[in-house]
Amino acid sequence: TILLESGTDVAFSATKQNGGVIHPGYDPHPGTLKAKLNPPGARMYPRLSKELGFKILHTGTLVVAYSDQDLKKVDELMDNARINGVEKVERLDFEQLHNREPHISDKALGALLANTTVMVDPFEVAIAFMENAMQNGVELGLCQKVRKIEKRAEEDFVVYTQDRQYETRFIVNAAGVHADDVAAMA
């Protein structure tokens, strides 16, 4: 098993620029794949941080409402959270919000508080996952940009990079912002 990385290191592209907020899942529209996968994925991070040795900050998230329209949006997000199975989400009124955050603007009317939001260093997380994969037998091919994927037999593929080719039965496309381009090659 090999992981092909187009950059000079893992997390070389979009990952290193990610903000590192692990969203608990109140944003995705219920019924979507993201709504199904986001909450359980987010709940995995405390365990993964212990197992793989990366730092995690339990920050929580406030979505603050400054208008009646914003309050409606907060209520929609609360509904999403309930339907999507997000735990420890609260609707704060004016008084609760200002008691929690005394320096917030008096124009703030209320908020959604998601207590399970955590933050990570995306580069550190990517390195931890790659180190774990390598400890479990995965090779890392750096500077290996996929140029072409050819389907050979019923279950075989050949993946071409700029200077090598790899024969495989399975391809896991984790190309980030370039995932659509790689998928179109298969």
Regions found by a protein language model. Give the residues of each.
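Hydrophobic anchor at the start of a short beta-strand
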Residues: 1, 88-89, 171
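Short, intrinsically disordered, charge-balanced linker/junction segments flanking boundaries
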Residues: 1-2, 179-186
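Glycine-rich FAD pyrophosphate-binding loop
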Residues: 1-17
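Short loop/edge segments at beta-strand edges and connector loops
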Residues: 5, 58, 93-94, 142-144, ...
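Short beta-to-alpha linker loops that shape the active-site pocket of alpha/beta-hydrolase fold enzymes
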Residues: 7-9, 97, 129
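Short amphipathic alpha-helical segments
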Residues: 15-16, 76, 183-186
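Dinucleotide-binding Rossmann-like beta1-alpha1 core, especially the glycine-rich loop
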Residues: 20-100, 109
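Helical element adjacent to the flavin cofactor pocket in flavoenzyme catalytic cores
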Residues: 111-170, 174-181
